[in-house]
Amino acid sequence: MSSLFCTMVEKAMGGLALKHGFQVTERGRSLIAFETTKVEMALSYDDQRSFEVGLGLSLKIDPPAQPSHSFDELLRALNVPANEWSTGYAARDVEAAETIVKKMAGILERHAALLLNADPDAWVKLGEQRRSDCIAYAATTKMAHAKRAADEAWVAKDYQKVVAALEAVASELGKADAAKLAYAKRAVSP
């Protein structure tokens, strides 16, 4: 299976790899890695559990600053239209994985040439996308924790805890949760 996957990826990525100077640096059971003097790209296929194809892209720096950027990050940072990538990553077999890898190669060719050629501005933009994603994730997680704590306190009619949970995120609350906070504040006011 692995050699079939690696052979298929080499064929599907061949034109892209040649155009941007990538060489195969690693072939494993279900992983193949390419690199230039400045960029690393790895494709993997989990044929044991998730049956998903993965792609990671990273700028070669010493020491490596972060994990490689996922294909999802690339799609967001490059503003790839949804109609170009309307599929997921699951592939029940190597033939289905080949379809996914070919789509990935096409998107990289059309949208990621600057990244593949190690353009500093393109990599800064990709890094900014990751930071933006992290900030959004942290805000979403903070809100979810606050709402969960407030909901538990609400059921217990512990309005002091409702206020404590929601006050930190008050500016981000929707109408219903803002009303819940206002009610809880009135309930604990002397």
Regions found by a protein language model. Name each.
Residues M1-A12, V24-P190:
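Intrinsically disordered, low-complexity regulatory regions enriched in serine/threonine/proline
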